[in-house]
Amino acid sequence: MPVYNAPTRDTRFIVNEVLRLDSYGNLPGFENATPDMTDAIIAEAGRFVSEVIAPINLSGDREGCTRHPDGTVTTPAGFKEAYRQYVEGGWGTLSAPAAYGGQDLPHVMGLIMELYLASAKDRKSTRLNSSHVLIS
């Protein structure tokens, strides 16, 4: 089974050295984007995608979703639990406004999570993060 390791080192370099995200701390939405905060988010997002999301891709490919005659749908093994952890971790709300339950972080922090989900070949990444489009 393929193993996915999120490129956290490269991501930290881009955020801290290239974008210098901390230099925008005086702008709305950037107040909490300190190097410590962004490093912690990058590390945990990488861990979550590498350890929780990537391993269930195989069951998704093999099992797929099943629609039952009563209209209910069963997802592949591990998907329900992974989604629960995704929601509880607040991963879909990183860059959403606090007024709508978001974390008010710069949009780039949400994009990092999207990048990790997509690069782990997670077929549901576009559905998981579509809520930011509704709020924007």
List where the protein language model places each region:
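Amphipathic, small/basic residue-rich leader segments at the start of a protein or domain
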Residues: 1-125
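Single conserved hydrophobic/aromatic residue that forms the stacking wall/gate
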Residues: 128-136
